[in-house]
Structure formats: C-alpha cells, structure tokens
Amino acid sequence: MNKKSFGNKLVASPYIVWSAIFIIVPLVIMFYFALTDNNGVFTLANITAIGKYKKAFGISILYAAVSTVITLLLAYPMAYFMTKLKISSQRMLFMIVMIPMWMNFLIRTYSWITILSNTGLINTFLQKIGLIDKPIKLLLTPGAVILGMVYDYIPYMILPIYSVMSKLDKSLLEAAEDLGSNSFTKFKRVIFPLTKPGVISGITMVFVPSVSTFYISQKLGGTKTMLIGDTIEY
C-alpha cells in the first residue's frame, strides 16, 4: 500500500465511522425489530401487517410531495434573486435564511400555533379589521401541516440551489443572449439544466424529512392527521 492510498483512507475514515454509526447501525436495528416480535423471536407478522398503515403512508407521501413542490416554487426564484445581488447583500440574505436553522426545531414549529390558533395573530387581526366575525379554523388542518413543513424545510431547498446557481458561468448566459435566446429559452436551455443538481439535492433534503416527520403533524395537524412518523411513534 503506497502512502497516497493510505493517506486517502485515513482522511476518509471519519466519514466511514460516521456512516457506520449513524446510517448502517440504525438500519440493522430497524431490520431486527421488523423481523422479530416483542420477545425477540423471528416473525414476518410486522411485514405482513404493513397494509394496515397504507393510509398513513399515502397521506405522508402526499403531504411531503405537496410541501416539496411548494418549497421548490418558492426557493428557486429566491435563490435566483440572491445571485443577482451584490456580494454584501447576498451574505445578508444568506444569514437571514440560516438564522431560523439555528433555532430549535420544536420552537420554530410551536410558534405557528400562536399564529394560526383561534386567538392567534391572523384571526385576531382579521377580526379587528372587520373581515371576519368569528375565528377561521387554521390550526389542526392539513394546510397547517403543509405550511409547517414548508417553513421548517425551505432553507434546505434554498441553500443547495443557491450554491449551484452562484457558480454558474456567466459567459454561458451571455452566449445564450448573443444567440437570440429570450429569458424563458435561456432559463429552459441553460439555467435550469445547470442548476438541476442543486434542485435534486434540495428535493431530497426536503422530501425525506417531510415524509417522516411527526412533530409538525402532531402540533399543527392534531390527532386527525396521522402521518407515518406519528404511527411509528405511537
């Protein structure tokens, strides 16, 4: 074994250990519990009973898909707008995007209760200006759950798209303009294909936690909104 090969393995060893502890081991534990009963005896009952939870699976995938699409539609133009600003302004907006991620996830989600409840900010404001006579049911609804997902996970969509978009070769955009491309054609033929890796990363980073979340659905959706994460917790 040469020194370069040994050095590469040495550098990669922390990642290998991290992957083994936080990815491989949890998967092994999950398969163990899936194939055993409460006494540790081998059984396929847990696998065959998965059909009972198809509704929870369906709702989880639907909510995650809707929230991912909404997040993408909001994050993509936001990331594009950020790249058009001065470096100092980009850094400021980057910090604004990052700050919510520094806050506790539970606090971020719980704050929406004070906004969406019958006595929350939205209903109180609408009643004071005379648009409604009684509170609108905003909390404990599917819309509240999707809103919570979008709010909590939108930074994970913005960051990879912005990272890719900020590194676009400006000469390619100029060449497209010189060849007579309008804004839509330039986006379709140049910008979007080159930023697709960031979009795919963002979709993955939003969809996966959305489909498995349970705290957002509990606090903003109530017991009537049972996602697969809630089913596993119970």
Question: What do these predicted regions represent?
Answer:
Residues 1-29, 91:
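N-terminal signal-anchor/first transmembrane alpha helix
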Residues 3-7, 44-56, 214-234:
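Interhelical loop and adjacent transmembrane-helix boundary motif
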Residues 1-3, 9, 66-98, 113-114, ...:
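Transmembrane-helix boundary motif in ABC transporter permease subunits
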Residues 109-150, 184, 220-224:
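Membrane-interfacial helix termini and adjacent extracytoplasmic/periplasmic loops
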Residues 32-69, 135, 234:
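Periplasmic/extracellular loop-to-transmembrane helix junction in inner-membrane transport proteins
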Residues 14-23, 69, 99, 151, ...:
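Transmembrane alpha-helices
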Residues 30, 157, 198-233:
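Non-cytoplasmic
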Residues 24-32, 73-78, 106-110, 119, ...:
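Membrane-embedded alpha-helices of multi-pass transport/permease systems
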